[in-house]
Amino acid sequence: MLILSRKVNEGIVIDDNIHIKVISIDRGSVRLGFEAPESTLILRAELKEAIVSENQKASASVDESVLENIKKVIKP
């Protein structure tokens, strides 16, 4: 992991098209500003983890009876 120190109004550039700027630092909280192409997905880490967790739950909770019905419809 690369660790960089930045002050307010200083920034970081990633791949020439993603710009991250420190907007403010206040009582243990850092506000960051991001400039990136619209196609670039930017998420807070906890939101990304929640999405992954929900996707895993959704894929794991398949009703076995539904699978059996699908097997009956799709015969080899």
Swiss-Prot record:
One of its GO terms (molecular function) is mRNA 5'-UTR binding. Keywords: Bacterial flagellum biogenesis, Cytoplasm, Repressor, RNA-binding, Translation regulation. GO terms for cellular component: cytosol. InterPro entries: CsrA, CsrA_sf. It is found in: Cytoplasm. It comes from the Bacteria. Homodimer; the beta-strands of each monomer intercalate to form a hydrophobic core, while the alpha-helices form wings that extend away from the core. This is Translational regulator CsrA. It comes from Helicobacter pylori (strain G27). The gene is csrA.
